[in-house]
Regions:
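A short alpha-helical cap/connector motif
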Residues: 2-19, 29-154, 161-229
Length: 229
């Protein structure tokens, strides 16, 4: 009788220990492929200070802070590493994108056709300490986007709106599955024949893309690429 009870106690103890171990693993389990953003407090402080001091100086061709934060969050959340920006302007959105990439270990290619804006952007990237994460090119995006080899996992389009669909179709084959194509100044309420409306209608029709529009700032379409069925 004593031996039988001892076996029961051993079985009970083992079961209880197993349950505790499994519960602990379920609470503290971290996926093997996940990576925490790289910490760089000095760079973070430098970027925040620059963005704060420059907040009232950006031209209309730059994104508002809320949209910059949105782009940053998308990159961090998905651990993107290879980004393309079409339309650098003077560097506001590029700073947000490169700041995120500095944490994921990635790099940004950004394109602008205007020499003045390009030079100003280069200076802003230097001031903020993000130059090593940015490959800024003075070029015609109509041509260069086609020539870039990729692959990319994040794209932000903020150049000539009538060319949005063309930019998308040129870069789409180079966008990884799970990657994200974003475009600025997009609204669900904007119909008609504008470049933004034509682009949005087209990308929403694609079965291997999931597209939403964030209207909090200047309006950003967010299109995630899914595996083709």
């Amino acid at each position: 009788m004593f031996i039988k009870n001892n076996k029961v106690m051993k079985t009970y103890t083992f079961s209880k220990s197993f349950i505790i171990i499994m519960f602990t693993l379920s609470v503290f389990y971290i996926p093997l492929n996940s990576q925490s953003p790289k910490a760089n407090p000095a760079l973070d402080e430098r970027v925040k200070q620059f963005l704060g001091e420059s907040s009232g100086q950006w031209r209309d061709m730059n994104v508002p802070t809320s949209d910059g934060q949105l782009l940053y969050d998308i990159i961090i959340k998905n651990n993107y590493k290879s980004a393309l920006e079409i339309g650098t302007s003077t560097g506001h959105s590029g700073i947000w994108i490169a700041w995120a990439l500095s944490k994921t270990g990635g790099k940004l290619i950004t394109i602008d056709i205007d020499e003045g804006r390009h030079k100003t952007a280069l200076e802003n990237f230097r001031k903020v300490g993000l130059s090593e994460y940015i490959d800024a090119r003075l070029a015609d995006a109509h041509t260069l986007v086609k020539e870039l080899k990729g692959p990319f996992d994040f794209v932000f389009s903020d150049a000539d709106k009538d060319w949005y669909k063309n930019y998308f179709t040129d870069v789409e084959p180079k966008l990884k599955v799970g990657g994200c194509f974003t475009a600025h100044n997009i609204s669900d309420r904007r119909g008609g024949s504008s470049g933004q409306a034509i682009f949005l209608e087209y990308v929403k029709s694609l079965k291997n893309y999931e597209t939403t529009v964030n209207s909090a700032g200047g309006g950003v379409s967010i299109s995630y690429k899914k595996a083709a069925k």
